[in-house]
């Protein structure tokens, strides 16, 4: 297959964000590209790298790390010893399971400029996220990068779900129709794989999976773990009513009386006096703490809209947060 069809990270790297998320179709070459990049950085500049997986068993075959990319570097010796990577006899990088990040706190990595975290979004049949996973990755980044500027962490995943601990932690709500969602210090890239998918559909395996849920993820970069039920942009005639803050995320609640629908959105009126929260962790000035939603008119209406099927959510991330909110309210 033509090399130009595979993933090229250069545009993503040009944005120079410290934290990058790349979510692309399976087989498009994300992992391959993010092996080649740090190897090149070491050969040219002596910059080391760290390869991260979630748990130790996922590194059981790390001895094969260089196998697929060795052809790109015929004049260099690429060797793995334990969980260390060597290039031309020099230490180039480490493989680290995120689950043991605490054991890395006393280690120093002054020459590491790149962390690559592969499969950062858990797939259905894989192991669970580790407890406080985002904090674990941030602790590892802090240990490795310290206060250096020319550093970056690149997290890779297949198209599973935009609802994951990382996007929730940083309040990132990507537009899945845009290739690059760029924030102050982070970036989400959802590569366009149309040409790659067209060619892969011509293969025997591509024909086998075409039209299946697996094919939607592998060929079309569709987020198969996300439900589109009740996902709908709010109408232009909807009016803002109140806000509710949950886990640091502010949700705006809007109503369209003509359509008889209620919408939950990130958009809200920051000057409103109708701001509610369910936890003391979120409680702040000019908010009302609600311990029983049945005692509050607005939250009763929100719960009723949800239970009767006329509540809509702006996107999957908002939907997921709202569902957690309803579980907190003991509405199942």
Swiss-Prot record:
Highest taxon of source: Viruses
SUPFAM superfamilies, A to Z: P-loop containing nucleoside triphosphate hydrolases
Protein keywords: ATP-binding, Hydrolase, Late protein, Nucleotide-binding, Viral genome packaging, Viral release from host cell
Keyword Nucleotide-binding listed: yes
Cross-referenced InterPro entries: P-loop_NTPase (IPR027417), Podovirus_Gp16 (IPR008784)
Enzyme superclass (EC): hydrolase
Region listing for DNA-binding, in residue ranges: 233-332
EC number: 3.6.4.-
Keyword Transcription tagged: no
Positions annotated to bind ATP: 24-31
Region of interest called ATPase, as start-end residue ranges on this chain: 1-207
Protein family per UniProt: Belongs to the phi29likevirus gp16 family.
Entry note about domains: The N-terminus contains the ATPase activity and the C-terminus (CTD) binds DNA. The CTD is likely a vestigial nuclease that has lost its hydrolytic capability since Phi-29 is not a concatamer that neads cleavage.
Annotated function: ATPase required for the genome encapsidation reaction. Part of the active packaging motor via the binding to the packaging RNA (pRNA), itself fixed to the head-tail connector at the unique portal vertex of the prohead. Binds and supercoils the pre-formed, unit-length DNA bound to gp3 to produce an initiation complex for DNA packaging. Provides the energy to actively pump the viral DNA into the prohead. Approximately one molecule of ATP is used in the packaging of 2 bp of viral DNA.
Name used for this protein in its record: DNA packaging protein
Organism: Bacillus phage PZA (Bacteriophage PZA)
